[in-house]
């Protein structure tokens, strides 16, 4: 019987390495796909490892700039903070991984794609809904969800089949990282009362170890896109990396969160998102300067829905595409400079300016240079309060009667 081809999202870890052998037993030829999302792994090694374990072909694709410009940028412009805290680090990368899985599957003539998600996480939903949206005819295989092995059983299978066991396997943590940040769960973090140990963090310093003097960064934006740091122009992926280092040194972006997962359980997660939190903070302040009141007040409702759609794996849904169009329209005049103080875990905006600023000092000032028409206030108040006044008059008459 001819073997079918499957494209596997490959990380180099134990689960996806074992999945190669498991899929071989199911009569598949495995094509491994590893993406460089800015996590800092030795991906050349990961690519070769897939071949050594048994994949017939292995791809390593650098998608950092695509991830920055088409995924992280939208998240920043929409100020996506799930449940007010989590900037969607992992959720943002899943639709891009799904997109590349589908592209390689179509290119290679594969009939299926596979991922290494468990049956109790959000990522299985994000991958599979995205894949269905992009190519509903591809079979999706989830080996880890299907085999239901304990960790001990999985290690035993790996040893029996000569699958290399990672040297960091004894680490209690489950970590996912990309340009936009780092997520960490499992181990002691499963106890919501336990303080995260310092070795749970990598991108940020503890407050006790951060500099005792603040550092200032000036972030330049053009039409809602961060383009410069302290006067130096960067591609967006490099700007994010540079800001991760700057803000992380000051302990910015540590998040300890008990979140409501899509699959119905609560999960305690620890995140590090120094650049994401700094950029979201700065961008929001520039919007406050440049957006008209009606748009500024309406946009958070759209942001909330976009955040939910991305978290729930609906990146490729029609509603998300429609809301993205609204978001892009709001960014046309979000151009300017924001000065941010990085100090002891905080990113504090201390200045903002824009050629499209709607702040008029002559109207806002209380000095002799005031140009606001105070006489207009009387008529405005009369008309603005008229519905309330009429309602009160009518109901007071009923009480008196």
From Swiss-Prot:
Q: Reaction catalysed by this chain?
A: L-citrulline + L-aspartate + ATP = 2-(N(omega)-L-arginino)succinate + AMP + diphosphate + H(+)
Q: Where does L-aspartate bind?
A: 118, 122-123
Q: Which InterPro entries match?
A: Arginosuc_syn_C, Arginosuc_syn_N, Arginosuc_synth, Arginosuc_synth_CS, Arginosuc_synth_type_1_subfam, AS_cat/multimer_dom_body, Rossmann-like_a/b/a_fold
What are the GO MF terms of this UniProt record? Answer: argininosuccinate synthase activity; ATP binding
Which EC numbers characterise this protein's activity in its record? 6.3.4.5
Instruction: Report the pathway entry.
Output: Amino-acid biosynthesis; L-arginine biosynthesis; L-arginine from L-ornithine and carbamoyl phosphate: step 2/3
Tell me where on the tree of life, at the top rank, the source sits: Bacteria
List, in alphabetical order, the GO biological process terms annotated in this UniProt record.
argininosuccinate metabolic process; L-arginine biosynthetic process; urea cycle
What assembly does the database describe for this protein?
A: Homotetramer.
Family of this protein = Belongs to the argininosuccinate synthase family. Type 1 subfamily.
Q: What is this protein called?
A: Argininosuccinate synthase
Gene it is expressed from: argG
